[in-house]
Amino acid sequence: MMVEIEHTPNPDTLKFLPGKKVSEVGPIEFLKNDKSIKVSLANKILSLEGTVMVFFGEDFITVKKEKDLNWEDMKHGIISEINDYYSKGNEVVVGKDLRLVKILSESVSDSKPVESNAVVNKINEILDSKIRPAVARDGGDITFKSFKDGIVTVELKGSCSGCPSSIMTLKQGVQNLLCHYIPEVKSVEAT
């Protein structure tokens, strides 16, 4: 199997494309010190020296490394784990198995209930249709957290988390787009 590698705007992350489905339940992120991970490929990649985060998108895997390490020393091990996983006949990394979805929802960061109103619905619609696809191309994800007093709070995940250019993307891209389409939005901040 040929796993393609794409660079992201974040020098500490790489996007791995196995050419197969990765997640059927939406984007999901795991951190190295999370003891509750029930996804075998996440555990295997995070057990490699220098990896600190693994992020599964629909058809890609983003891996974040420690800042002082070199990708050339790490890529082979990550690709090897991905190839090994799929060569054993596994179809997807994160499937729609309800038990697994429950496990994942318990291990993912604290999800707050989404406020229900027209502005929030419009924010989520724009995030889903215009912003998330662009962020996914860079190996990341953006999720809505809250809207209060004109301020939209979002969470950046995957390669976007800790990326040097994420503040510029947030202000010049996300904020400008949301303010353009939704007059009630005055600012966008990340948690």
Label for each model-derived stretch:
Residues 1-191:
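Domain-level signature for proteins that mediate thiol-based redox and metal-cofactor handling
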